[in-house]
From Swiss-Prot:
Its main location: secreted. This is Crustacean hyperglycemic hormones 3. Belongs to the arthropod CHH/MIH/GIH/VIH hormone family. SUPFAM superfamilies: Crustacean CHH/MIH/GIH neurohormone. Hormone found in the sinus gland of isopods and decapods which controls the blood sugar level. Has a secretagogue action over the amylase released from the midgut gland. May act as a stress hormone and may be involved in the control of molting and reproduction. Keywords: Amidation, Carbohydrate metabolism, Cleavage on pair of basic residues, Disulfide bond, Glucose metabolism, Hormone, Neuropeptide, Secreted, Signal. It comes from Penaeus japonicus. The lineage of its organism: Eukaryota, Metazoa, Ecdysozoa, Arthropoda, Crustacea.
Length: 117
């Protein structure tokens, strides 16, 4: 049975949730976000050391491997080291060997060469 006190508490929680979500929406709808005038350029999310061909799909694939590797080992050096030098490093190769079946490793190596130096 719902008491008036419980109903009042639920109403207060609902009001807080609605207020928080509407303020978050108004924050997201800032003039720069809605006008298409983004301050970040598309490549700013990726390592500037990657001077090869810019391919979002390949970068996402390589980044996902590093994320998965970090999720397995939970070591901060894995998270940062795997992406260093545009994936040309020992940590990336170790992650590749550990997580990717051997018949698919060449595909990741080719992606690394494409986006790399």
């Amino acid at each position: 049975m719902v008491t008036p006190r419980m109903l009042s508490a639920l109403s207060a929680v609902l009001l807080l949730v609605l207020t928080a979500s509407s303020s978050a929406r108004s924050f997201d709808a800032s003039p720069s976000a809605t006008s298409g005038n983004h301050s970040l350029n598309k490549r700013s999310l990726f390592d500037p050391a990657c001077t090869g061909i810019y391919d979002r799909q390949l970068l996402r694939k390589l980044g996902r491997l590093c994320d998965d590797c970090y999720n397995v080992f939970r070591e901060p050096k894995v998270a940062t080291g795997c992406r260093s030098n545009c994936y040309h490093n020992l940590i990336f190769l170790d992650c590749l060997e550990y997580l990717i079946p051997s018949h698919l490793q060449e595909e990741h190596m080719a992606a690394m060469q494409t986006v790399g130096k």
